[in-house]
From Swiss-Prot:
In-chain residues carrying the UniProt-annotated modification Phosphoserine: S355
Phenotype when the gene is knocked out: Thymus of embryos show a small number of T-cell progenitors that are unable to progress through thymic differentiation. Adult mice show vestigial thymus and lymph nodes and a reduced spleen size. In the periphery and in the spleen, display an absence of mature T-cells, a reduced number of NK cells, but a normal number of mature B-cells.
Chain positions of all zinc fingers (C2H2-type): 216-242, 448-470, 578-600, 606-628, 634-656, 662-684, 686-709
Subcellular location: Nucleus; Nucleus, Nucleoplasm
Protein name per its UniProtKB record: Zinc finger and BTB domain-containing protein 1
Organism taxonomic ancestry: Eukaryota, Metazoa, Chordata, Craniata, Vertebrata
Domain remark in the UniProt entry: Both the BTB domain and C2H2-type motifs are necessary for transcriptional repression activity. The BTB domain is also necessary for oligomerization and efficient sumoylation. The hydrophobic cluster preceding Lys-328 enhanced sumoylation efficiency.
One GO cellular component, as annotated: nucleus
N-terminal signal peptide: none
Function (record text): Acts as a transcriptional repressor. Represses cAMP-responsive element (CRE)-mediated transcriptional activation. In addition, has a role in translesion DNA synthesis. Requires for UV-inducible RAD18 loading, PCNA monoubiquitination, POLH recruitment to replication factories and efficient translesion DNA synthesis. Plays a key role in the transcriptional regulation of T lymphocyte development.
Gene source species: Mus musculus
GO MF term set: DNA binding; K63-linked polyubiquitin modification-dependent protein binding; protein heterodimerization activity; protein homodimerization activity; zinc ion binding
Major subcellular site: nucleus
One Gene Ontology term from the biological process aspect of the record: positive regulation of natural killer cell differentiation
Protein's UniProt keywords contain Nucleotide-binding: no
Length: 713
């Protein structure tokens, strides 16, 4: 159980560090007065500083508040309140002080002065900026407090050359002995913080009040610590070596040793202290103040012998420390044994840059739903591996056509091996009929379709070379789809072939956007149709595998209803007045065509004015600027965590789900079961006003209306 004084102790140490300037990473200027502070403390107490540090992460070393209606006196008291939870002196005007706190958007603004004013402002337990002029000894943010002892006016301090402040304890005791005279000790000892001796207290309350009086000092760098554990952790990484190390290491513990009743006890204690290692027990660091000697001073000869014994013991301890090397290891987050059932996919820098095109599509009005599913790859010779993957939508510039489902080459399908084909991207050798599914499932982000002929090409140089010779006669048959008779019919009718290919491409596009791909095992069902998760977008027929639905969609082109949709697609092409001279894709506005050219040229013409990073698309730049400003587009309603991309927000929301719960991918509403989610999804569908048919995308509903209900003249 944590001690009740821990929070007060941490605040005290932070305030001491602020006064000393130790680890301060921010400077606040008000007129000609400068205040040092820690960003973490300011951001934890003030919403104003939190947002400022988020928006100006690279230029917050110094902050000027002179143009604000905040006086230096008020800000000094605000810093006291941030670091201590109270103020040491009353402000001249509490209303002005409260206005300044509200302006800085402090999370806790007091209603009255009595709530934050210290009951005993003269107490030295909590020092402030106003009391920083006290001559107490403080090393790197740790203030050394000592017992209140009766001294003569000219008596030297036991630890420091300057007098230090004391801690007021409930019960004052008369000292039982005089302090050790330091006249014969070297002068460098006065500059090093020594381990203060702690008296054995009778009550726990006294131990709490005396807690600030104990410190542990590093022999190498002189840093002071409040407990032995912090000192042990610091020693493992301490690399500082000062010139006074060899001359003072044997002294810093001997100073706290009082003269024993006999010289043998004193020499024994000195030798024991000098041979301590940093892994010793805590009781070896403590000295009993009640072990006071009867004599106030010892002879110079006995002191010298003690020092020599201490130096000899220290050399042995240094040799022991050199041989004993402690390496602190952190446990790995994901052990290798736990990862054996997961597919680990290495994403290159090129893939990350190209995948940003897909990430930005979530801002489009007709955005497809992101489907999260459990995929289980079950092979004959290998065990099943389960991975959770989001089904990403296809880029807008890739919607001009979809795969003819074969790697691009100059040979005709007749000359190729009818049984096997190799993937152009990963080199995997698979059958021709499975090649289409392989490209859809594995490489959808690295392929692009020609807008004129529909041939699938790998992004990059192949796409540009093909676009230059796309007007030349070439074999345009679709590989792996339909039978040989269907291919012959398509070759005899090139115009109909082009129309059918375009609509087939659009259907595959919508198929990827609008349907779930989930595990076929019954216990992992996410929706009631998970046994046959693949559905033809034209006739609604469901299939168990992706290969079956792709083959069915090629034969589904012959239906009259689908031909009507082809006519509707041709009729709306006349509205696209701006066409790309490389791939032939049409756009409604010239600015969209200009942005589309970056797909071919790979020219990143949109530059961030803050950091200089370049982007292909303007919406990528807008999203990047939002990250600079700290403006999260999606905020979790449970824990208030912000995300900039929708699919990242969905992944985060999934972490809040309990067993059996599911989440709507559109409005992020959580439902206890899949049946309620199915009923809720009707709210997000587009309904035909005439026949009541429902569609996921608005353009699908419009196509349905034009093909079914619009009277043609």
């Amino acid at each position: 159980m944590a001690k009740p004084s821990h929070s007060s102790y941490v605040l005290q140490q932070l305030n001491n560090q602020r006064e000393w300037g130790f680890l301060c990473d921010c400077c606040i200027a008000i007129d000609d007065i400068y205040f040092q502070a820690h960003k973490a403390v300011l951001a934890a107490c003030s919403s104003y500083f939190r947002m400022f540090f988020m928006n100006h992460q690279h230029s917050t070393a110094q902050l000027n508040l002179s143009n604000m209606k905040i006086s230096a006196e008020c800000f000094d008291l605000i810093l006291q309140f941030m670091y201590l939870g109270k103020i040491m002196t009353a402000p001249s005007s509490f209303e002005q002080f409260k206005v300044a706190m509200n302006y800085l958007q402090l999370y806790n603004v007091p209603d009255c002065l009595e709530d934050i004013q210290d009951a005993d402002c003269s107490s030295s337990k909590c020092s402030s900026s106003a009391s920083s002029r006290q001559s107490s000894k403080m090393i790197f943010g740790v203030r050394m407090y000592e017992d209140t002892v009766a001294r003569n006016g000219n008596e030297a301090n036991r630890w420091c050359a300057e007098p230090s402040s004391t801690v007021n304890t409930p019960h004052h005791r008369e000292p039982e002995e005089e302090s050790l005279q330091l006249a014969n000790f070297p002068e460098p000892l006065f500059d090093v913080c020594k381990k203060s001796s702690v008296s054995k207290l009778s009550t726990p309350k006294e131990r709490v009040s005396r807690r600030f009086g104990r410190s542990f000092t590093c022999d190498s760098c002189g840093f002071g610590f409040s407990c032995e554990k912090l000192l042990d952790e610091h020693v493992l990484t301490c690399t500082n070596r000062h010139s006074y190390q060899n001359t003072t290491r044997a002294y810093h513990r001997i100073v706290d040793i009082r003269d024993g009743k006999d010289s043998n006890i004193k020499a024994e204690l000195a030798e024991k202290d000098s041979s301590k290692t940093f892994s010793a027990q805590p009781d070896k660091y403590r000295e009993d103040a009640n072990q006071a000697p009867d004599d106030s001073a010892s002879t110079t000869g006995s002191r010298k012998s003690t020092v020599e014994a201490g130096i000899a013991g220290e050399e042995k301890s240094r040799a022991t420390e050199t041989k004993r090397i402690i390496i602190k290891m952190e446990p790995e987050d994901i052990p290798a044994d736990d990862m054996k059932d997961f597919n680990i996919i290495k994403v290159t820098e090129k893939d990350c840059n190209e995948s940003t095109d897909n990430d930005e599509l979530e801002d489009e009005p007709e955005e497809p739903f992101y489907r999260y599913y459990v995929e289980e790859d079950v092979g004959i010779k290998k065990s099943g591996r389960k991975t959770l993957k989001p089904r990403m939508s296809i880029s807008v510039d890739e919607r001009g056509g979809l795969e003819n489902m074969r790697p691009p080459n100059n040979t005709s399908p007749i000359q190729e091996d009818a049984e096997n084909a190799s993937c152009e991207l990963c080199g995997l050798t698979i059958t021709e009929e499975d090649l289409s599914s392989h490209y859809l499932a594995k490489h959808i982000e690295n392929i692009c379709a020609c807008g004129k002929c529909g041939q699938i090409l790998v992004k990059g140089r192949q796409l540009q070379e093909h676009a230059q010779r796309c007007g030349e006669p070439q074999d345009l048959t679709m590989n792996g789809l339909g039978n040989a008779d269907e291919k012959m019919d398509m070759e005899e009718n090139p115009d109909e072939q082009s129309e059918i290919r375009d609509m087939f491409v659009e259907m595959l596009d919508d198929f990827r956007d609008n349907h779930y791909q989930i595990n076929s095992i019954q216990k992992k069902q996410l929706f009631k149709h998970s046994a046959c998760p693949f559905r033809c977008p034209n006739c609604g027929q469901r299939f168990e595998t992706e290969n079956l639905v792709v083959e069915h969609m090629s034969s589904c082109l012959d239906q009259d209803m689908f031909k009507g949709a082809i006519m509707e697609e041709n009729e709306r092409d006349h509205r696209r007045k701006h066409f790309c001279n490389l791939c032939g894709k049409g756009f409604y506005q010239r600015c969209h065509l200009r942005e589309h050219y970056t797909v071919h040229t790979k020219e990143k013409q949109f530059v961030c004015q803050t950091c200089g990073k370049q982007f292909l698309r303007e919406r990528q730049l807008r999203l990047h600027n939002d990250m600079h400003k700290g403006m999260a587009r999606y905020v979790c309603s449970i824990c208030d965590q912000g995300n900039f991309r929708k699919h990242d927000h969905v992944r985060h929301m999934i972490s809040h789900l309990s067993g059996g719960e599911t989440i709507c991918q559109v409005c992020f509403q959580i439902f206890p079961n899949n049946e309620q989610l199915e009923q809720h999804m009707d709210v997000h569908l587009y309904t035909c006003g005439i026949c009541g048919a429902k569609f996921n995308l608005r353009k699908d509903m419009r196509s349905h209306y034009n093909a079914k209900h619009l009277k043609r003249t």
